[in-house]
Amino acid sequence: MTENVSAAQPAKAPAAKFGGKGLTIAIAVAAIVTVAGLALWVFQLTGGMVNTNMRNLDSWGLYITMFMFLVGLSAGGLIISSAPRVFGVEGFGGISKIAVWTSICCTVLAIGFVVVDLGQPLRLWELFAYSNLGSPLMWDIIVLGTYLILSIVYLWAMLRFEGGKGSATGLRVVSAIALVCAVLVHSVTAWIFGLQQGREMWHTALLGPWFVSSALVCGVALVLVVVIALRRAGYLQLDQKHVVKMLKLLGVFVLVDLYFFGCDLLTEAFPAGSGADIVAMLTTGALAPFFWIEVLGCAATAMIAFTPKLRTNPLIVLAAVLAIVGIFCKRVQLLVGGFQIPNLDMPAVVSGPGLADAGAALQSAGGAMVYFPSPLEFGVMAGVVGLGALLLLLGLKFLPLKPTEQSH
């Protein structure tokens, strides 16, 4: 019988003992997928980026889309972990360590997608040797690296505090620094796109706060899915009131995100200029499926969050998954849509492997999807995601992430 959680109720007893053969099999599968993805990446390196479907008109693709998406997942998880400590309010039932470990795994994945997007990763050192500190790309490299280190330090500080070796004040200071960095990392990622004047769809001051709201949506949603799954597997016991609290928080963040989306659409469409073409592309053009999946999925998430009778565990998981999928669709719209809009008057452009007439090439770019990932890109993506799953499972098996009486 489905559990109704419209009001706070004691959590059910764990269905099974966590670990054992099932966990070992899951770790093995994740490791195999990771190795397979690594092999495909080596193939990509030996053959060059021509093996992908990224070209001059669409120089960023699936890898950078996943980078944006995973930065959001990581930032959102750390924010909901650190904010209760910083502001001295009740947390979510001792899930802070799990949320932070999830954030660390997502950050590693985000960095991994940047690496696989490099045609020559052995030249990574040149980013630091010849760095341009006036570039948002360099800002993001610095902030993302700092963020990963801070996340690890924050987890270490929580473990020390629970072991009686740290002070509450020190942990709160680390929490505050981590919270600021979590907001900053997603803002800087947004500025990579928002400060590009040549891309009309990206060039908006709204992009920074919009990215932060999206991070909160998918971060809370991911933590919801993880903790419900772990409770089901017997890893932790979590009172249902904390699940409901996170669901309500997710509903608020979803509404804020949809509000930002509506403001952006109205600002672009109302003058009836070139911005109207962007809105048409999103609502009825090549990107319409992603647009409507996001809007309808996030609306359904909000409805489940604010309707007590719908707060059953299966629907809570569905709401969280819809929110995650919706934010991913937004990332696809942003990145691919930015390249759909021609931004230069050129006598000719390189489209694919050959030289094409500018009019025909740009018409093709605007009339249909200018980019769709190759099977190789999907394979490499699966390998990187497999690495994240492997890290998450290993952490659950070997790290003391379960709640204790001192967690909150």
Regions of interest found by a model, annotated:
Residues D58-L122, W139, V143:
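Membrane helical hairpin/interfacial module
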Residues L40-I64, V116-M138, G164-G166, A190-F211, ...:
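Membrane-interface interhelical loops and short amphipathic "cap" helices
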Residues L109-A110, P136-D140, F328-G337:
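Juxtamembrane membrane-interface segments at transmembrane alpha-helix termini
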Residues M68-G72, W139-I152, A215, A286-A299, ...:
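Hydrophobic alpha-helical transmembrane segments
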Residues M1-G76, I80, A389-L393, Q406:
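N-terminal signal-anchor module of multipass membrane proteins
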Residues E3, P314-H408:
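TerminUS-proximal long segments
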Residues A13-T34, V89-G91, A129, L133, ...:
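Long, contiguous internal "core" modules enriched in hydrophobic/ aromatic residues
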Residues A39, S81, Y154-L155, M303-I304, ...:
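Alpha-helical transmembrane segments
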